[in-house]
Regions:
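Local sequence-structure signature of Cys/Sec-based thiol-disulfide redox active-site neighborhoods
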Residues: 3-42, 111-152
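Glycine-rich FAD pyrophosphate-binding loop
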Residues: 215-217, 231-236
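Structural micro-motif
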Residues: 57-74, 159-176
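Catalytic cores of nucleotide-enabled group-transfer and carboxylate-activating enzymes in metabolic
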Residues: 20, 98, 151, 156-158, ...
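Beta1/beta-strand and adjacent pyrophosphate-binding region of the FAD-binding site
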Residues: 205-222
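Non-catalytic, surface beta->alpha helical segment in thiol-disulfide oxidoreductase systems
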Residues: 65-99, 174-202
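Thiol-based oxidoreductase modules, predominantly thioredoxin-like and allied folds used
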Residues: 49-59, 146-160
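Gly/Ala-rich phosphate-binding loop of Rossmann-like dinucleotide-binding domains
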Residues: 142, 227, 231
């Protein structure tokens, strides 16, 4: 399924992996997409000695990512190709501590302070250009907070669920069965909605008070000049 050139790129991307990852696959022997899923994941696993596949018979089609023999909370009920292939790669890199899409430390601390358990399910279309950003943001949150789990679901493979939930647009994010978000979304926006629904653990919330000498509000020439002046003077 993967072109030889892409496999060579993946070997370079995965060269620095330190943890051992397993694609824990559960798929029906008669599922029409079984061969496609196994081919994709086995191709990815061939690109690193730190990635393996385990296949179990199941009633549907899904796989979970395990790290060093333990579940990570990230599950795909889909064949993550197309726009979602990057979501799979980033999930592995983030879990290994080498991802590039984490927010700043203050936002990460907010994620860690979320009260759990939180079970998220995101319904996507593999042709959707807005879906990967949401999937990747929620996977990153799952990596940061062990009380969060996240499933990405290809609606085309689970049309019965799409119909039952009356999903009209993608991505559609459900938090413990309750519709949380529909459409394009940024990390901070999604986090704010989760905080509103689940609350935060005050014992884990960031309590450090930061002091600043100056705050630059706005942009334009005046804002740029103020920022340059502050930097030259060593102001915080």
């Amino acid at each position: 399924m993967l072109e030889p050139a892409l496999k060579e790129q993946l070997k370079g991307i995965f060269a620095g992996l330190e943890a051992d990852f397993t694609f824990d696959i559960s798929v029906s022997a008669s599922h029409e997409s079984r061969a496609g899923l196994l081919e994709l994941l086995e191709d990815v696993a061939e690109c690193s000695t730190h990635i393996t596949c385990v296949v179990n018979e199941g009633s549907g089609l899904k796989f979970a990512i395990w790290k060093n023999g333990h579940p990570t909370g990230i599950t795909f009920r889909a064949i993550p190709n197309g726009h979602e292939f990057t979501s799979l790669l980033l999930a592995i890199l983030n879990l290994d501590g080498k991802g590039k899409n984490f927010p700043d430390e203050a936002v990460c601390n907010r994620v860690k302070a979320l009260k759990g358990p939180v079970h998220l399910v995101t319904y996507v279309s593999l042709t959707c250009t807005n879906c990967p950003d949401v999937v990747q943001a929620l996977n990153a949150m799952t990596t940061l907070n062990p009380s969060i789990t996240h499933e990405m679901v290809d609606g085309a493979l689970y049309q019965d669920e799409v119909d039952a939930l009356k999903i009209q647009g993608v991505p559609s994010v459900f938090a413990d069965g309750k519709l949380l978000h529909v459409g394009r979304g940024e990390f901070g926006e999604l986090l704010a909605k989760l905080e509103a629904q689940y609350g935060i653990d005050e014992t884990k919330a960031e309590t450090e008070v930061k002091e600043y000498d100056v705050i630059v509000a706005g942009g334009g020439p005046a804002g740029v000049s103020a920022a340059i002046y502050s930097a030259r003077k060593g102001l915080r």
